[in-house]
Amino acid sequence: MSTPMIFAIPSKGRLKDQVEAWLADCGFKLEMTGGARGYSAELSGLPGVSVRLLSAGDIAAGLDSGDLHLGVTGEDLLRERGDDMDSRVMLLRALGFGRADLVVTAPKNWLDVDTMADVDEVGHAHLARTGRRLRVATKYVTQTRAFFARHGVADYRIVESSGATEGAPAAGAAELVVDITTTGATLAANGLKILSDGVILKSQAQLTASLTAGWNGEQLDALRRLLSVVEAKGRAGKLATLVWPAEQDRAAQDAVAAFIARGGSRRANGALLATADLFDAAAALAEAGVEPVTVSRPDYVFESRSAVLDRFAEALKSKI
C-alpha cells in the first residue's frame, strides 16, 4: 500500500476558511474523513494525499521536522523556526491571504523615537542611566534578535510573552513590543506606534514543502499534480482570450502582433493575452476594423513544466 503525501492545513479560524476557499477555487473539495469535527480529510480529485488539520504553529513545526510533506501556514511562523529556514523548507507559493506584519513598536509618548537608530540611542542612554537594558516583549524571539542585530541594536533583552504582548509596556513588563499585526489598531489602542523602519516581515499564508521529509516518487507525483492545478489557476487569473471572425484572422493577427511578441500566444481565430493588455489589444483590433471581438476568461491555463517543482526537486537532490 502506497504512503500518501501528508498535506496540513489550519484547523480553525479565518485562515482555515480562506484555505478551504482557495482549494475550492482550484477545484479541490475538502472531504472530512473523521466526521465534521475530525482532523483528517481528503481532497476530491487528488488521490494519494492525506490532509491533516492542525494549528498553524504545529504546521510550521511539522514542516520543519519533516513530519509533514506539505502545508499552508504563515510565513512568520516558518521564519521563527530559525535563520536557516530555507535549508529545511521551501516556500512554493504565496497565497495572498492571511496577511500580517511583524513589527517593532514603541510607546507613542516616546516622541523622539521613530527609527531603529533611535532605539539604539535610547538603549545606550537607558543602560547608562539605570544599569538595565531595554526590555522587548515578543513571541518572535528568533526574528527579533536577527532584526535588532541587522540594525546594530545590542542594549536590550528579550522578555518572552505568551499572552497579550501589546499590553506589556502598560503593565510595566517591557519598554518595546515586537508583535504581529494586520491593521495596527490593537497596538494603537494600547498606546504603541510602529517604528518607521520597524517592519521585520510582511507575512502571508504560504504553500510550503518540507525539505526534511522523506519524499518518494508517488508523493512527488501528488505534489506535481497539485502544483499543476494551482499554477494553472493562478495563470488563468492573469489572462484572457480574444476571439474574432475567421475571415478577419489575418488582419486581426497583424493588429495584435505586438502583444503576442511580449508574451501572448496565438489561437485559432484568436489570441491569449495578459489581462493588462486586454483593452489596448481591443483598441488595436477596432482600429484595424476587426469586429465583433469577444472576450472570455479561462478557468485554467496549464503548462508542461513547473519551474517551482523543478526547483524543489533540485533542492531535494542537494539534501541527499
UniProtKB/Swiss-Prot annotation:
GO terms for biological process: L-histidine biosynthetic process. Its cofactor is Mg(2+). It catalyses: 1-(5-phospho-beta-D-ribosyl)-ATP + diphosphate = 5-phospho-alpha-D-ribose 1-diphosphate + ATP. CDD domains: PBP2_HisGL3. The keyword Transmembrane helix does not apply. One of its GO terms (molecular function) is ATP binding. Its main location: cytoplasm. Its EC number is 2.4.2.17. Feedback inhibited by histidine. InterPro entries: ATP-PRT_HisG_long, ATP_PRibTrfase_cat, ATP_PRibTrfase_CS, ATP_PRibTrfase_HisG. Keywords: Amino-acid biosynthesis, ATP-binding, Cytoplasm, Glycosyltransferase, Histidine biosynthesis, Magnesium, Metal-binding, Nucleotide-binding, Transferase. It is found in: Cytoplasm. The keyword Chloroplast does not apply. Pathway: Amino-acid biosynthesis; L-histidine biosynthesis; L-histidine from 5-phospho-alpha-D-ribose 1-diphosphate: step 1/9. It is an enzyme of class 2 (transferase). Belongs to the ATP phosphoribosyltransferase family. Long subfamily. This is ATP phosphoribosyltransferase. The gene is hisG.
